[in-house]
Amino acid sequence: MPCDCSDTAVFAGLARQLPRDAVWVTSDLRRTHETARAIVHAGLPGPDPIPGPDALAIPGLAEQSFGEWQGLTYDELRHSRGGAFHRFWHAPAHERAPGGESFLDLMERVTRAIHQVFDANRGRDIIAIAHGGTIRAALGLALGLEPEACLAFTMENCSVTRLDHVEGPGMGHGWRVVTVNRPPR
């Protein structure tokens, strides 16, 4: 699914907020690459090409897979099922769409990807261009939340969520949530 990158003020706002000299990662989905390119085009020094050796596409950061439902609107899905609800809608944290993932599956995948990226880049700022579900899962890791609690977060497109990894004397060991869903302007 392509990304609408026409609102240049949004990307200029992101370019002002995000750290310089950071490691860049995206998911393997095209819209994250387009978003990253738009941020660089708006003035944040960044890698070229995206994805490329300096902007890694990490499949583990992809959005939750909805399997056979991928790309369908809610109305299309409801119509295709004759108005009947699939059990996924009653317990989306643990149930899977046909051929897809549960939110718990997503959390496990995203947690592995975050540890992989963090371990390879310890001490560096990381800009991760990701998806709403991926960000909810990252917040779950940072806050030690159950999957159901993560689904309570709303993530707007192009918002900034900042997580800092902390460790050391008097700091503990883990994650600090600095901001969630901050508008880019």
Positions of predicted regions on the chain:
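Short glycine-rich phosphate-binding loop at a beta-alpha junction
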Residues: 21-28, 54-57, 125-129
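GST-like fold's C-terminal all-alpha helical module
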Residues: 106-132
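Active-site-proximal alpha-helix that buttresses catalytic centers in soluble enzyme cores
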Residues: 1-48
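Acidic, low-complexity terminal tails and accessory targeting/binding regions
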Residues: 64-76, 119-124, 140-185
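Phosphate-handling substructures
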Residues: 2, 41-112
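GST superfamily/GST-like fold recognition
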Residues: 132-136, 162
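Alpha-helix N-cap/helix-start capping motif
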Residues: 29-33, 82, 132-133, 157
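Active-site signature of alpha/beta-hydrolase-fold catalytic machinery across serine-
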Residues: 38, 137-141
